[in-house]
Design a protein with these regions (language model features):
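Short, small-residue-enriched loops and turns at beta-alpha junctions
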Residues: 40-42, 185-188, 218-220
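Short acidic, glycine-rich surface-loop motifs adjacent to enzyme active sites
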Residues: 175-189
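Catalytic PLP-binding core of fold-type I/II PLP enzymes
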Residues: 190-223
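Conserved small/polar residues in nucleotide/adenosyl-binding loops
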Residues: 226-232
């Protein structure tokens, strides 16, 4: 009998160890890991350099909050800024938290402009997380079911409806950001047309909005680093 909450549809397999792209279950069966922990084990399993780095750090410090300067954070942030073309980095615990931060940035941006009730345009088939705020920004009815009331302030449009996006922005002066996945990952791997993304950036520049890309799934390397291949760079 399991004492875990039944909130996951678990498969009847329990893994024992992994090496590179391979996994072995407790019975010794070998599997090619095409899931990568839902796109987070981007360097594979038991990479010797990573194992050494984790063991070395664990022997020194496990955690020492962000009240203090952390040299390794600074080093990694510098590399991320160098390779991404963005200006600053916020480290957090999950993709959900990253998207919550993006939503907060957009709202704070709106408040700084004197907008009391900031609105964010999101896409109907995107997935941004399972917290109340990120769930409210997610259009999949099967994910949203049973968790209302939702956080207000999100406006859904079809991912190909650039004219619809422009119309909303022109009619609703509370819009502060357009938030989207360059590759929609929840219902299949569906890239958004580059002309649409270019148009979104033009709308954002024209109306002083934030263009925010959620690459928690597609940005960890499985399908390249999408924003680096886009015709424009996001603000967030």
């Amino acid at each position: 009998m399991s004492h875990l909450m039944k909130n996951y549809g678990r498969l009847p397999v329990s893994f024992d160890h992994g090496q590179g792209v391979w996994l072995w279950d407790k019975e010794g069966h070998k599997y090619l890991d095409a899931l990568a922990g839902i796109a987070v084990n981007s360097v594979g399993h038991a990479h010797p350099r990573l194992v050494r780095a984790i063991a070395d750090q664990a022997s020194k410090l496990i955690h020492c909050s962000n009240y203090f300067n952390i040299d390794l954070q600074e080093q990694v942030a510098e590399k991320l800024v160098e390779h991404s073309g963005l200006e600053a980095v916020f480290f957090c615990n999950s993709g959900l938290e990253a998207n919550e931060c993006a939503i907060k940035i957009a709202r704070k941006f709106g408040h700084a402009k004197g907008i009391e009730v900031p609105n964010i345009i999101v896409l109907k088939h995107a997935f941004h997380g399972r917290s109340i705020a990120t769930l409210s920004a997610t259009g999949n009815p099967s994910v949203r079911a049973d968790f209302s009331p939702y956080t207000e302030g999100f406006i859904f449009v079809d991912e190909s409806d650039l004219d619809g996006i422009r119309k909303i922005v022109e009619e609703n002066k509370n819009v502060v950001a357009i938030f989207f996945e360059p590759i929609l990952g929840e219902g299949g791997v569906v890239p958004i047309d580059l002309s649409v993304i270019k148009g979104i950036r033009e709308i954002c520049d024209e109306h002083d909005l934030l263009m925010m890309c959620d690459e928690v799934q597609c940005g960890m390397g499985p399908v390249s680093y999408t924003h680096l291949t886009l015709p424009t760079t996001p603000y967030v």
